[in-house]
Amino acid sequence: MEHTPQSQLKLLLAKGKEQGYLTYAEVNDHLPADMVDADQIEDIVQMINDMGIRVYEQAPDADEIMMTEDSTDDDAAEEAAAALATVEAELGRTTDPVRMYMREMGTVELLTREGEIVIAKRIEEGIYTVQASVAEYPPAIASILDQFDRYEAEEVRLSDIISGFIDPNAADIAPTATHIGSDLSQSERDKDDSKDDSKDDDEDEEEEGPKGPDPEESKERFTQLREVHENTLKIIADKGRGHPEATVALFEIGELFKEFRLMPKQFDRLVKNMRATMDKVRVQERLIMKLCVEQAKMPKKNFVKGYTADESSIAWFDTELASKKPYAEGLKMIEPDVRRCRFKLDIIEKETGLAIASIKDINRRMSIGEAKARRAKKEMVEANLRLVISIAKKYTNRGLQFLDLIQEGNIGLMKAVDKFEYRRGYKFSTYATWWIRQAITRSIADQARTIRIPVHMIETINKLNRISRQMLQEMGREPTPEELAERMLMPEDKIRKVLKIAKEPISMETPIGDDEDSHLGDFIEDTTLELPLDSATGESLRNATHEVLAGLTAREAKVLRMRFGIDMNTDHTLEEVGKQFDVTRERIRQIEAKALRKLRHPSRSEILKSFLDE
């Protein structure tokens, strides 16, 4: 009877407890043959030692065993069980990517409805922090207001700018009918899923949620934002950014702006612009530090202390220049370059209306908000990976591997996390199912075929197949393209085109015949090669032509060769041949006519007559 790895380890531990020690040879004999990782073996030996069973290179003497303190006690069985469980976990390791993914996914606990709301609030808080920070960056608000002006000029759609507005005073769970269906039994869910699966490939992509923001409310909100923005700029211009009134105004515009639910494209654009400004600042500051520390040999500690004391002026540099310190002479040599960098920083401050310290503070708070939202989104995604797998299982054997289906489903899950609105009352899984299923079905339509077909054409093919099946049931026969065109209200030529596209490619390795000893590719003509019959006929014609030309004079033969391109790359005109022989065109025509008359003689033409049918 063959022992399992677990039973082998149990025997090993029992033997060790009985004799009080083990040798490395005994440990190796009881380990699985496929365990060759030195780290794993060392971990097992360490666990055996921790249980009070010493492991030796060779069997010790009886005296040495007596001197060794017996550390095993009543808890030895429990320790052995714990160690064995750890060892079994080690033995259960696999290199199969699906199993590894499942094991890692299983370590994350599922979320309750309350847990989802907590994480959704953290995501919202992170986004709020970013938007409130960006609101203090004057070009950002001006950019959004400019986008709204373009909407009013009918250059862009309102739905390209915002998706709606957030009411911070709304309840966490809106008392709406969206709860209906979230408590279905598992069997009812399975039935619904099976129905949806049959429709997924046939339906066009639908929009989730409301169709778009309310134009009247949007106009009112943007007008309010414009007024607050202009008032804030006026206060800052009159009293300075550090004035208490300016602080209140900045807080007010931040609170107002974070209620705007910006479209991801707009949100990313604002963050990117702020990042670009911060990058410009960093470039100049790094250049100043490089000049001072590396070229002028100013101690880095002194530079950091002086520069950070007042980042909006160059007074620190003038102070260091006036000092009698050893590096003052070096600073004097780089003074033009440092002042040039400071001038560029002044331009950035003028363009943004912000001091360098304020730009850094906004960027810092924005980064904190992004990190908070990113961590919360990661938690939400990891807690719902099981949902992706349960949906992906229903789409196997459709042209994509299971891991690919999981990956595509995970992309849909991440989209669902980005768009999830917990205030509507949906449980996240109810909302995410649509996005996961949509991502998977789209990927199957886009990637499953050997020859890629656009998604919109896949939808047309699915619709055509569905109607074709219906007509087959109604008429008892396959419908004609004309009948399909009439039923689908489409031109007949388009129906024929769709039918042609819908054909599945067949492998050239498909077995043919009862014995399956030949393949489909063996019966396909290779048009790139010349047929043996044509090759033999051409060679015979070439030999016959050379034979009859040999019966002419050298001049006549050459004229015919040039005129008809025999053994040459191309044929020649009378004028070209005349230049070759230094005679007139008429003379060449006469020579050609005479040579052809000779070839028409039965003694010569008989050789070529058999090639006329070829």
Curated annotation (Swiss-Prot):
Where in this protein does the record put region Sigma-70 factor domain-2? 380-450
Q: What InterPro entries does its record include?
A: RNA_pol_sigma-70_dom (IPR014284), RNA_pol_sigma70 (IPR000943), RNA_pol_sigma70_r1_2 (IPR009042), RNA_pol_sigma70_r2 (IPR007627), RNA_pol_sigma70_r3 (IPR007624), RNA_pol_sigma70_r4 (IPR007630), RNA_pol_sigma_70_non-ess (IPR007631), RNA_pol_sigma_70_r1_1 (IPR007127)
Q: Which UniProt keywords apply?
A: Cytoplasm, DNA-binding, Sigma factor, Transcription, Transcription regulation
Q: Residue numbers of motif Interaction with polymerase core subunit RpoC?
A: 404-407
Give residue spans, biased composition: Basic and acidic residues.
186-198, 209-222
Function of this protein? Sigma factors are initiation factors that promote the attachment of RNA polymerase to specific initiation sites and are then released. This sigma factor is the primary sigma factor during exponential growth.
| Similarity comment text for this entry | Belongs to the sigma-70 factor family. RpoD/SigA subfamily.
Subunit structure and binding partners: Interacts transiently with the RNA polymerase catalytic core.
Q: What is this protein called?
A: RNA polymerase sigma factor RpoD
The protein's organism comes out as Shewanella violacea (strain JCM 10179 / CIP 106290 / LMG 19151 / DSS12)
Q: Which gene encodes it?
A: rpoD
